[in-house]
């Protein structure tokens, strides 16, 4: 029996998503380039289009800056950038909506980078109770200092119309953005709030290829007379991992676990801890094993939602060193 379809009629209009933007973190939605950001939670309406000024604090230097006015100064700086944006867009074509939002809300987003590097500098395992305590202390301090700074700005320069009576200059002050490029430039520290993908890898950037060796692991290996080519090649072949090394103690191995070796539920728990202090969101990535069952992934996402995490960013499955290790250990002439 043969059936011939003569005509297809759509009874409603549907959204079309064309995922065709190469080498960018964007996609087309109904002809509009959309950024898949998860740190920004601001509104857009017919008359306003959100804008937000972002910058990140290097947590590797947290002990040096936590008792200074560095955080407050960063809030002052970002607010002045917002003022400059408002001034420069006056009368500019097609900028009425974002300028109006900037005037009414002056939204800022102070974030962080170098979280895993900070823990490793103190020889703290990502999964440890001490890490959880540091996590809470850092973001509680960040919240208090940002609130103090925006209150001072409101007292000096006044409150936007939308915030009249709230004693605030800015609708938001904290947003944890992804910092893959900036963290690498800023001393090759770990990106944002996530663990390092690998202890040893080659990063291919526009300016060239750069080799990354975990500086805190390097220091440890030097103390054991193991900082040599043979050791690092062994680490590379094992996907940037040190979990196989008999020369390291269990405590030392725990400190240098990579992204995929840390239980992802632990990453969600830390995100939930800090979310209470973040008025916007956090760029939260998860490293899911390729063999993970859909049910397990679903349970992890539900756990994140139930824990108070506002959203998730990327779901990854392999790190750069693992990919390179595969190419090293694979005979290309043996492939079919």
List the predicted regions and their residue ranges:
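Generic recognition of flexible, low-complexity loop/linker segments
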Residues: 4-9, 15-16, 41-42, 101-104, ...
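Structured loops at beta-to-helix junctions and adjacent beta-edge loops in soluble globular domains
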Residues: 20-22, 31-32, 55-57, 177, ...
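Intein-associated homing endonuclease modules of the LAGLIDADG/DOD-type, together
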Residues: 2-36, 185
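Function-dense linear segments that define catalytic or interfacial modules
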Residues: 37-102, 114-118, 189-215, 220, ...
């Amino acid at each position: 029996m043969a059936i011939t379809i003569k005509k297809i009629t759509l009874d409603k209009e549907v959204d079309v998503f064309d995922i065709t933007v190469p080498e960018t973190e964007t996609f087309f939605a109904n002809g509009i380039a959309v950024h898949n950001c998860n740190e920004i939670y601001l509104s857009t309406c017919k008359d306003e289009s959100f804008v937000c000024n972002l910058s990140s604090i290097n947590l590797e230097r947290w002990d040096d800056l936590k008792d200074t006015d560095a955080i407050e100064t960063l809030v002052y700086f970002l607010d002045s950038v917002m003022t400059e944006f408002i001034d420069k867009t006056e009368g500019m074509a097609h900028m009425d909506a974002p300028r109006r939002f900037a005037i009414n809300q002056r939204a800022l987003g102070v974030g962080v980078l170098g979280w895993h590097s900070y823990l490793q500098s103190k020889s703290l395992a990502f999964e440890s109770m001490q890490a959880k305590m540091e996590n809470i202390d850092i973001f509680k301090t960040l919240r208090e200092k940002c609130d103090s700074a925006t209150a001072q700005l409101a007292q000096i320069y006044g409150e936007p119309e939308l915030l009249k009576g709230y004693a605030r200059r800015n609708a938001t002050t904290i947003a944890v953005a992804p910092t893959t490029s900036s963290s690498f430039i800023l001393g090759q520290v770990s990106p944002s709030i996530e663990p390092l993908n690998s202890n040893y890898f080659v990063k291919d950037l526009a300016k060239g290829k750069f080799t990354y060796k975990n500086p805190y692991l390097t220091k440890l290996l030097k103390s054991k007379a193991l900082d040599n080519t043979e050791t690092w090649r062994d680490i590379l072949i094992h996907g940037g991992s040190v979990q196989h090394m008999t020369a390291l103690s269990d405590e030392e191995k725990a400190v240098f676990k990579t992204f995929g070796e840390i239980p992802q539920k632990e990453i969600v728990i830390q995100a939930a801890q800090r979310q209470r202090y973040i008025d916007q969101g956090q760029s939260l990535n998860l490293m899911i094993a390729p063999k993970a069952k859909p049910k397990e992934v679903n349970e992890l996402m539900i756990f994140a939602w139930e824990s108070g995490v506002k959203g998730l960013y990327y779901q990854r499955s392999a790190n750069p060193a693992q990919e390179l290790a595969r190419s090293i250990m694979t005979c290309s002439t043996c492939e079919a």
